[in-house]
Amino acid sequence: LKLSEKAREAGAKVAVISSPHPVQLIKLLEHYNPEEASEIYLDAVDFCTTLVNEKVTVGLGELGRPHFEVDQKTWDLCNQVLKESLKMAKEVDASVILHTETGTPEVMADLASISNKANFPKSRLVKHYGGIGSIENSHGITVSLLASNENIAFASKNNFSHMLETDYLDDPKRPGAVLGPKTVPRKSLKSLQEGVISEEQFSKIHTDIPNFIYKEFI
């Protein structure tokens, strides 16, 4: 929130999201039983929905499940907690950013099923760190593609609806990871100039879809 204020001071409009990261649930399970760990995690989600209700933030993220292998009981618990989190997000009309394993058509179908069970609108559910596998058949979920040349060209050629991201970490130990903060505007403009994406696609990627997902940039 402090960083968003600095961005506004610099003239930017910002949409802020917050939530406990799904890996935090895994860490809680090291110290608590599944019921206790879930309750603590969902209490944090509830706090974040309060921020949305108070117009401090516009959505929840990153919610989801671990991107690494866990045992079946833990996996089932993570999916159950994700479903409950989506129900809570829907109550305050929040968008949700998902952190999950690598997206494939099968993964996207499973995430869409969880969203349906929570009665959460899939169009406002964003698969973060998306790639070709997640956008080939997104099952109605919005995909935020990592802004690589390959991803941009593939999505534009097939006219797939998407947003772009860098997953920039701002970690001094990993400078520029995953992609630098200037990557999206730089590659978007280059792709537009070279005819890789059309003006209509450019507008959808950077204006129409973000405005639909986040509703308000302050």
Task: Spell out what each predicted region is.
Residues 2-52, 61:
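Metal-cofactor-binding active-site regions of metalloenzymes
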Residues 87, 185-218:
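Mid-to-C-terminal alpha-helical segments outside catalytic/metal-binding sites
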Residues 14-20, 58-63, 96-98, 124-128, ...:
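Hydrophobic faces of well-ordered beta-strands that scaffold small-molecule active sites
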Residues 21-37, 56, 70, 169, ...:
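Active-site gating loops and adjacent loop-to-helix segments of metal-dependent hydrolytic enzymes
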Residues 20-24, 64-67, 102-104, 131-132, ...:
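Active-site-proximal loop/turn and secondary-structure-junction residues that shape catalytic pockets
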Residues 99, 160-178:
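Short acidic/histidine-rich active-site segments
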Residues 31, 49-131:
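Divalent metal-binding pocket/active-site signature
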Residues 1, 37-45, 74-84, 181-184:
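Charged helix-capping and loop-helix junction motifs
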